[in-house]
């Protein structure tokens, strides 16, 4: 059987959980992935849901209501696409074990959210901090002043004599 290009393509970067993600969440996701790989959907579902709850706790958005916690997490991190939280709510809020494809989707979606929060969010903050330092270091006396542009069609001031 021939191997397709999609079989050899590297996994998207967000699927590899970065070291910036808190260790307790990473450990639970590793367990969820291991269970998924062995088709232990009950264990995998429990682990990913525990990982999500741990994220709520770490992010200080924990509520008894799973959906309310997701809303709070989305409000805390508005740069994360709301659709990701909707998928997590749909798949993660129940008590029953998920089927393999749904479990895979929940794990991948949660990894995407974690990537947005802990990797891209951190990179954005680092970029902004660097740019802020550069701007503060500018010597305003050596920065050319911006001259106002004359508007086309504006009346000119003539001296009266």
List each model region and its residues:
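Charged alpha-helical initiation segments
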Residues: 1-41, 144-161
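A ubiquitous short alpha-helical element
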Residues: 12-18, 36, 55, 74-80, ...
């Amino acid at each position: 059987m021939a191997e397709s290009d999609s079989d050899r393509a590297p996994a998207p970067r967000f699927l590899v959980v970065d070291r910036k993600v808190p260790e307790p969440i990473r450990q639970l996701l590793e367990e969820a992935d291991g269970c998924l790989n062995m088709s232990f959907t009950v264990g995998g579902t429990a682990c990913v849901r525990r990982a999500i709850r741990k994220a709520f706790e770490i992010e200080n958005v924990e509520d008894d209501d799973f959906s309310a916690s997701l809303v709070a997490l989305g409000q805390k991190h508005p740069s994360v696409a709301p659709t990701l939280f909707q998928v997590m709510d749909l798949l993660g809020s129940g008590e029953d074990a998920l089927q393999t494809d749904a479990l895979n989707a929940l794990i991948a979606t949660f990894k995407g959210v974690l990537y947005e929060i802990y990797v891209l969010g951190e990179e954005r903050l680092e970029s902004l901090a660097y740019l802020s330092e550069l701007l503060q270091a500018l010597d305003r006396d050596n920065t050319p002043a911006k001259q106002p542009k004359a508007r086309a069609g504006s009346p000119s001031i003539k001296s009266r004599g």
